[in-house]
Amino acid sequence: MRVNITLACTECGDRNYISKKNKRNNAERIELKKYCKRDKKSTLHRETK
């Protein structure tokens, strides 16, 4: 079952990206290194509710 998730920057807290994930394959929260516009650099983004 695919669900929509939001990815938030760990440094500034901005919610920059919306993605989808398969809950059956990825039960835990996703962490990806993505570009943050506010910080103007690549930072770690975590899945939020």
Curated annotation (Swiss-Prot):
Name under which the protein is recorded: Large ribosomal subunit protein bL33A
TM segment ranges: none
Keyword Electron transport: no
Pfam families referenced in this protein's UniProt entry, alphabetically: Ribosomal_L33
Family, per entry: Belongs to the bacterial ribosomal protein bL33 family.
UniProtKB keywords: Ribonucleoprotein, Ribosomal protein
Domain of life: Bacteria
Gene name linked to the record: rpmG1
InterPro entries for this protein: Ribosomal_bL33 (IPR001705), Ribosomal_bL33_CS (IPR018264), Ribosomal_bL33_sf (IPR038584), Ribosomal_zn-bd (IPR011332)
GO BP, one annotated term: translation
PANTHER family: 50S RIBOSOMAL PROTEIN L33, CHLOROPLASTIC, LARGE RIBOSOMAL SUBUNIT PROTEIN BL33C
Gene Ontology CC terms: cytoplasm; ribonucleoprotein complex; ribosome
GO molecular function terms listed in the Swiss-Prot or TrEMBL record: structural constituent of ribosome
Keyword presence, Ribonucleoprotein: yes
Upper lineage: Bacteria, Bacillati, Bacillota, Bacilli, Bacillales
